[in-house]
Design a protein with these regions (language model features):
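A short hydrophobic beta-strand segment most commonly corresponding to one strand
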Residues: 73-76
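Short active-site loop/helix that positions an aromatic residue
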Residues: 58-71
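Short alpha-helix boundary/capping and kink motifs at helix termini
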Residues: 1-55, 65
Length: 77
């Protein structure tokens, strides 16, 4: 996994996300930090465009931006 600047990743709009999944990420058994750094379910990105396209992890990317993170761990596929 690499640390990737959020400014290099495509934007995610709240209206395209599932509210219950966002709630689960924020209030679930595992902390958001644990879920963000998950090696079993990593955030996956595609490098093929000028901003990295999200393959997996849209909800986590959205919340990381909301929480003020500047970078996140991700894998490129």
């Amino acid at each position: 996994m690499e640390n990737v600047r959020l400014s290099d990743i495509e934007n995610v709009s709240r209206n395209e996300l599932n509210s219950s999944k966002l709630d689960s990420l924020e209030n679930g058994y595992d902390s958001f930090e644990t879920q963000l750094n998950s090696r079993n379910n990593p955030i996956a990105l595609d490098r093929s465009s000028w901003s990295y396209r999200i393959i997996n992890g849209r909800h986590r990317v959205f919340l990381a931006r909301q929480k003020g993170y500047s970078s996140i761990p991700a894998e490129f596929v």
